[in-house]
Regions:
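Short linear sequence motifs
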Residues: 8-11, 66-70, 86, 103
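Terminal beta-strand-rich extracellular "head" domains
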Residues: 32-85
Length: 116
């Protein structure tokens, strides 16, 4: 598949994963869906230099109850949310209910003095 949607972090990394240019952390992810997704888990997956793909197990997750459709919800990350320059990362989205069309914005905070 050449889309940005996948149920796995394996393969297709040129479409769904990216390399962070600086040390930093995941501050938050804002998600909006056309459906009431119910209890939803968003996770940060990462791997360091020398590993092709982000880890299939999230290093940290946040759960939010997305009870209303067409409404933005904030997933606020506070621990185990750091990454290092050159890491490959991915964000996972795991809703209880079918999400259908969903949009998300990821807010990363970089330390510009610690780059690749």
């Amino acid at each position: 598949s050449t889309t940005g949607e996948s149920s796995s972090t394996s393969g297709g990394n040129e479409w769904r994963h990216f390399v962070v240019p600086f040390d930093g952390y995941l501050d938050q992810v804002v998600v909006r869906s056309e459906e009431a997704c119910g209890s939803t888990i968003v996770g940060l997956h990462k791997s360091s230099t020398g590993t092709e793909l982000p880890n299939t197990t999230a290093s940290t997750t946040v759960t939010v109850d997305m009870t209303t459709d067409d409404t933005a919800y904030k997933f606020d990350f506070t621990s185990s949310n750091t990454f290092s320059a050159g890491d490959i990362i991915a964000i996972s989205f795991d809703p209880t209910n079918d999400a259908n069309d969903t949009n998300a914005t990821t807010i990363l905070v970089y330390d510009g003095s610690q780059g690749v």
